[in-house]
Amino acid sequence: VNESWVLTAHAATDVEGRPVDGQTVLSDDCEITAGSSVRLGFCVTTPLSASARLSFLSDHRPAGAVDGVVLMAQTCLLGPGPENHVRCPQWPTSVVLVRGRRGLAVKSRKDIFVDGSLATGLTPLSSGQVISGTDFRFRLEEINPER
């Protein structure tokens, strides 16, 4: 995947200890410092996906309760291994969310269910649907940006 993530600094920002004036391309596994003390880790978990993960290295957190942020390109991997964008250590397998023209779809090597029905192949998703397997369950929820 030959895509890059570009950071545009609108205030005091460092990447790997170097001040950013304007824009910079983020490299895998780099540290971003916003202001004087907010530290974020940037990681592209697998070369097979342009999606990336931001994790909080300092004690700062946004107003909503989150542990990290996924910057989703075309795919988002959820599962037990280090290549996953969302780490779920207890899951027996990985699940992939795929962005298409009509929205998100889901797929896995193991049997998964969408709202209780067996998902075959790449299965389209909509907000509110529940995706589950033998040892996991999650709900796809649309975030209202106006809140």
Language model features: what each stretch is:
Residues 28-48:
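Short, structured interface segments
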Residues 53-61, 66, 73:
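Flexible, surface-exposed loop/linker segments and immediately adjacent secondary-structure boundaries
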